[in-house]
Curated annotation (Swiss-Prot):
Keywords: Glycoprotein, Host Golgi apparatus, Host membrane, Membrane, Transmembrane, Transmembrane helix, Viral envelope protein, Viral matrix protein, Virion. It comes from the Viruses. Coiled coil: none annotated. CDD domains: alphaCoV_M (cd21564). The chain crosses the membrane at residues 48-68, 78-98, 113-133. One of its GO terms (cellular component) is host cell Golgi membrane. It comes from Porcine respiratory coronavirus (strain RM4). Residues 237-252 are annotated as: Interaction with N protein. Homomultimer. Interacts with envelope E protein in the budding compartment of the host cell, which is located between endoplasmic reticulum and the Golgi complex. Forms a complex with HE and S proteins. Interacts with nucleocapsid N protein. This interaction probably participates in RNA packaging into the virus. It is found in: Virion membrane; Host Golgi apparatus membrane. This is Membrane protein. The keyword NADP does not apply.
Length: 262
């Protein structure tokens, strides 16, 4: 995709016409009115013209973009995070529509090279969009959590306690999982996931769900203080397979719950 973008920019810059950086109020002539040597004119494509005339507007847009990308996390602001997710969800259909429209317009003027680039971009965008939906549905099938449709979510931590399943989106698969209990509140990866917990409610295993499999982490060590309901428990990888992460409330044993298939 980056290669296609670079090629498109190179073609736009080398095949452009003569543009004016400063225009008069009546037409498209240069500001000093000369046709040959105008210091306010340059020979470049549409891309350079846009940068020269809209550089301040683009800088404001990019500042907003940087702010959303850098601080679009739940621990900073849920509002900014929601804007970031909305942008990421809308990018696929917008880019797909733009590439299809550009392919049609290039075909109309018999610019078949750019038409080919536009078709290739549309195909790549559509394939990536379908892959996103496939992976999200696979992850939702395992966790029944709407975090599965977060474009940034590659894995979901699932903790079953008190007959409920608590989930936390992750960017990758951790080597080990640490659950921290502070005054009855359960934390994972620095986020509060449950309240009203005691040391007896800590699970014997936790799971990390991926689109292709579920990894089981077994409890290997803990240090708890019963009087203040404070402490920690550490889990390491023990097995992986097609396991469900849903909390079970029937009378199955721990091993039967673990082997419950999706």
């Amino acid at each position: 995709m980056k290669i296609l973008l670079i090629l498109a920019c190179a073609i736009a810059c080398t095949c452009g016409e003569r543009y004016c950086a400063m225009k008069d109020d009546t037409g498209l002539s240069c500001r000093n009115g000369t046709a040959s040597d105008c210091e306010s004119c340059f020979n470049r494509g549409d891309l350079i013209w846009l940068l020269a005339n809209w550089n301040f507007s683009w800088s404001i847009i990019l500042i907003i973009f940087i702010t959303v990308l850098q601080y679009g996390r739940p621990q900073f602001s849920w509002f900014v995070y929601g804007i970031k997710m909305l942008i990421m969800w809308l990018l696929w259909p917008i880019v797909l529509a733009l590439t299809i429209f550009n392919a049609y317009s290039e075909y109309q003027v018999s610019r078949y090279v750019m038409f080919g680039f536009s078709i290739a971009g549309a195909i790549v965008t559509f394939v990536l969009w379908i892959m996103y939906f496939v992976r999200s549905i696979q992850l939702y099938r395992r966790t029944k959590s709407w975090w599965s449709f977060n474009p940034e979510t590659n894995a979901i931590l699932c903790v079953s306690a008190l007959g409920r399943s608590y989930v936390l989106p992750l960017e990758g698969v951790p080597t080990g999982v640490t659950l921290t209990l502070l005054s009855g509140n359960l934390y994972a990866e620095g986020f509060k996931i449950a309240g009203g917990m005691t040391i007896d409610n800590l699970p014997k295993y936790v799971m990390v769900a991926l689109p292709s499999r579920t990894i089981v982490y077994t409890l290997v060590g803990k240090k708890l203080k019963a009087s203040s309901a404070t402490g920690w428990a550490y889990y390491v990888k023990s097995k992986a397979g097609d396991y469900s992460t849903e909390a079970r409330t029937d009378n199955l044993s721990e091993q039967e719950k673990l082997l419950h298939m999706v």
